[in-house]
């Protein structure tokens, strides 16, 4: 009985890890695929301006959101 419970637990953990990896890959694909524009400027990859992120980086106010694609994907630019 304990072996069966342990096997079921391991299967659940493996499923969760696989699902997390799939979700991460989908997010990375969106970041690579979507180019956004902030204030009419074309994307500037050297400063990551116009790149879609799932949250604008920098709690210090160095990044700000200029457009929203979905509830979780934002177009960000350096302030």
Swiss-Prot record:
Superkingdom to which the source organism belongs: Eukaryota
SUPFAM superfamilies: Defensin-like
GO cellular component: a single term: nematocyst
Signal peptide location: 1-20
Tagged with keyword Disulfide bond: yes
Residue numbers covered by the propeptide annotation in the UniProt entry: 21-31
Keyword annotations from UniProtKB, A to Z: Cleavage on pair of basic residues, Disulfide bond, Ion channel impairing toxin, Nematocyst, Neurotoxin, Secreted, Signal, Toxin, Voltage-gated sodium channel impairing toxin
Main location: secreted
GO molecular function: sodium channel regulator activity; toxin activity
Record's keyword annotation contains Secreted: yes
Disulfide bonds: 36-75, 38-66, 56-76
Compartments, as annotated in UniProt: Secreted; Nematocyst
Function of the protein: In neuromuscular preparation of crustaceans, the toxin increased neurotransmitter release, causing repetitive firing of the axons. May affect sodium channels (Nav).
Protein family: Belongs to the sea anemone sodium channel inhibitory toxin family.
Descriptive protein name: Delta-hormotoxin-Cpt1b
Source organism of the structure: Calliactis parasitica
